[in-house]
A protein has these predicted regions:
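Phosphodiester-processing cores and adjacent nucleic acid-binding clamps
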Residues: 1-191
Length: 191
């Protein structure tokens, strides 16, 4: 996830997107090398991207789920300006495919990332990874993805990427405790 800080950052982001499609396109996806991202990061905010679902590559989340050494995860986390965590229901496909034994692994991961953010002095932000506004719109997204030939998603896994209210997000992160949930859902999203 890349956010812009200002107009110069927007110009830098446009350049990164253009170059990713022209110079670094591969395996049906545009890519931005970290070396190029480092050159342009002055006016950007770079997040860890918590997504490790449906073939997306959230670097830190993938490392944690695959059992990488925590020191390696910590070292990689230093690259990012802030750390994202997603609702555990966003990861039901990993449980359904056997990549994780239960959603308890996601609770463990999100708690670890919260503590890691504190240790490294990085903001931890809860994001919903919303791909559509209403929960009932999941079927529309699945039709688009499956019809485009880009995915082999099982529809039953793709029902929780809707835009959640603050109350719904606080409930999703209630396992962190009331104060921590409020911090990552409300306070840190405004910093």
């Amino acid at each position: 996830m890349i956010l812009v800080k200002n107009q110069a950052g927007l110009r830098d982001l446009y350049e990164l997107v253009s170059r990713s499609h022209i110079e670094f396109f591969g395996n049906r996806k545009p890519r931005i090398p970290k070396s190029l991202l480092n050159e342009k990061r002055k006016n950007l905010l770079i997040a860890s991207s918590a997504s490790a679902v449906f073939g997306n590559n959230g670097e830190l989340a993938n490392m944690f789920i695959r059992g990488s050494d925590l020191e390696d995860i910590e070292e990689r986390a230093k690259f990012y300006d802030y750390i994202e965590i997603h609702p555990m229901t966003n990861y039901v496909d990993l449980e359904g495919t056997g990549d994780i034994e239960s959603l308890d692994k996601i609770v463990e991961m999100n708690n670890y990332f919260y503590d890691l953010g504190k240790k490294l002095g990085k903001i931890v932000v809860a994001t919903g990874d919303a791909h559509y506004l209403e929960e009932r719109e999941a079927v529309n997204r699945s039709v688009l993805i499956l019809g485009s030939g880009m995915g082999r998603r099982i529809f039953s896994y793709d029902k929780r990427l809707f835009f959640r209210t603050t109350e719904e997000m606080l409930e999703e992160f209630s396992y962190l405790g009331e104060d921590k949930a409020y911090e990552v859902v409300v306070e840190n999203t405004h910093k």
